[in-house]
Amino acid sequence: MNMKKFFAILLICAMVLSLAACGTQNSSADSTGQTLAATRTVTDRAGREVEIPIEVNTIVCLGSGAPRIAAYLQVVDKMIGAEDCDTGDVTVLRDYSWVYHDELKDLPSCGKGGGSGQNNAYPEQIIQLQPDVILAGFSAESADELQLQTGIPVVSVYYSSINFVDESFYEATRIFAEVVGAEERCEELLNFIDECKAELDERTADYAEGDKPTCYTGAVTFSGRHGFCGTYANFGPLMAVRARNVADEIKDVNYFETDFEQVLVWDPDIIFLDPGNMNLVSEEYVSNPEYFHSLRAVQEGRVYTMPSFNNASTNITYCLMNGYWAGMVLYPDAFGDMTMEDVADKVLSFMLGKNYYEDMVAGGLYYGTIDIGG
C-alpha cells in the first residue's frame, strides 16, 4: 500500500471515529437519559442484514441502477448527493439522468458512477453529507467496504440486466421502497410493468411457431460497443413477444460474439441493429459489401433499429418500449393499433413523469428501418 492511500484511509477512519465520539458525548450529556434513535433492519439484495433508521429522510444513491430506482419511485427529492455521471453532460442513453438532470446537476459529488457494481464512491464526501442511508447497486463486498469506510448503512439494490425485467429488479425496487417509505408507488410501478408484459404476451400467444418470422439482433452493447456479430441469446424484448431469435440455439449464454458465417447460415427473415453502433457496422460493410447484400433481410429491406437499453444497468423504460417495437415489427397484425409515439407516451409518462420521445429520437434512440450501406 502506498503512503498516499495509507494516509487517505487514516483520514477516513479519523472522521468516522470523530463523528462517533460526538454522538457518544451528546448521548452521555443528555440528562433525560433518552436512548439513541430507534432503528429497523432490512435485508438487502446481497442478503445482508442492514440496520437503518426508522425514518429515512436523506439518501445517497450509487452505482448500478440505484439512482434510476429513485427516479422510478419518485424520491429523487431525498437525494443529497449525486454521481459524476449524472451531474455533468448527460444524454438520453440513461433515462432517469436525462429527466432529472436539473435536480441532480447541482448536488454535491459522491461517486464516479456507472454500472460496474464495484465501489467507486467518494467516502470522504459522503461522510460530510451524512445521509441517513446509502442505497447502492453494489456487490456484497463493495457494500461492506463502503459501510466500513463511512460508518453509514449501505443497502445493496443491485439488479441484473438479464432477460426481460427479471425478478432481481422487482426485489431491488421493493427493498428500496421499504427503506424510503415508498411502498405504494412501488406496487403501482411493478403492476404497470406486469401489465405491459402481460399485454405483449397476450398479443403474441396465438401465433404458431412455424408462422413466426425468424430474427436476429446485432450490433448490441455489452461490456462496450460491438459490430454486426455482437448479439444476444435470450434477448429480453424478443422473449417478451415469443420471437424466434436464431441466436437462441446457442444455449446457456446471453450476450456473445458470433461470426459472419453463422449469421449467413441462420439467414434470418428480420434483423435488428442498435442504431448507436451503426458506425461499426458501416465499417464492416465497406470491407465486405457483398456479404451484407447476400442476407435476405438486407435484400428485402427488413432491417430495423433496436436501441440499446443498457446504460449503467438497465433502462427499464427502454426495455419495455423495445418489447412493443419488436411486436410491431414481427407481428404487424397483432400490433397494428399501436404507434411508438403512443407507447413512449404511456411508458415514459408513467415511469418518469415526462414524455421525452422527441428527445430520444434526436439523441439517436429511434425506432424505424436501417439501410445498411445506404
Predicted regions and their residues:
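Sec-dependent signal peptide recognition
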Residues: 4-12
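C-terminal motif of bacterial Sec signal peptides marking the signal peptidase cleavage site
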Residues: 18-21
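Bacterial signal peptide processing site
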Residues: 23-25
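Extracytoplasmic substrate-binding proteins
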Residues: 49, 143-223, 247-248, 305-372
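Structural recognition of the beta-strand scaffold that forms the well-ordered cores
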Residues: 58-63, 78-83, 133-137, 154-158, ...
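A short, structured surface patch at a secondary-structure boundary
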Residues: 67-125, 133, 246
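Proline-aspartate-enriched helix->loop->beta-strand connector
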Residues: 115-118, 122-136, 260-276
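Alpha-helical, coiled-coil/dimerization segments enriched in small aliphatic residues
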Residues: 227-254
